[in-house]
Curated annotation (Swiss-Prot):
Gene3D superfamilies: 3.30.230.10. GO terms for cellular component: ribonuclease P complex. RNaseP catalyzes the removal of the 5'-leader sequence from pre-tRNA to produce the mature 5'-terminus. It can also cleave other RNA substrates such as 4.5S RNA. The protein component plays an auxiliary but essential role in vivo by binding to the 5'-leader sequence and broadening the substrate specificity of the ribozyme. This is Ribonuclease P protein component. It comes from Chlamydia trachomatis serovar L2 (strain ATCC VR-902B / DSM 19102 / 434/Bu). Coiled coil: none annotated. The keyword Repeat does not apply. The keyword Nuclease applies. It catalyses: Endonucleolytic cleavage of RNA, removing 5'-extranucleotides from tRNA precursor. The gene is rnpA. It comes from the Bacteria. Keywords: Endonuclease, Hydrolase, Nuclease, RNA-binding, tRNA processing.
Length: 120
């Protein structure tokens, strides 16, 4: 049985990686989330980092948001070009999994060709 998790090599893990994407990434707003996208420098694999502030809600709400986003990204990852993405919530509501998957699949490739830095 295969593990249905997002592998460690598909995640942004270090602060340096998050800062690079935040500074150099193109901002793209979807209905449920805000994305920062930058083309991958070294590989064709996509990586994701998720940031959720304490303003979003209590720990169980923040953790649920992260689980939903990780799973949606895991499903669409094979169809994405090599990029690094930082995802943050918009508003305080939990995302809908199917809608979020569609948004990620649509918005990430849109943001990549124009990977110059832009404000949200």
């Amino acid at each position: 049985m295969s593990r249905l998790t997002l592998p460690k090599n598909a995640r942004l893990l270090k602060r340096k990686q998050f800062v690079y994407v935040q500074r150099n990434g193109r901002c793209c707003r979807a209905d449920q989330v805000t994305l920062r996208v930058v083309p991958s420098r070294h590989s064709n694999t996509s990586k994701v980092g998720i940031t959720v502030s304490k303003k979003f809600g209590k720990a169980h709400q923040r953790n649920r948001f992260k689980r939903i986003v990780r799973e949606a990204f895991r499903h669409v990852r094979p169809n994405l070009p090599g990029c690094q993405v930082v995802i943050s919530p918009r508003g305080n509501s939990q995302p809908d999994f199917l809608k979020l998957s569609e948004e990620l699949l649509q918005r990430i490739p849109e943001a990549l060709p124009l990977a110059s830095s832009s404000r949200c």
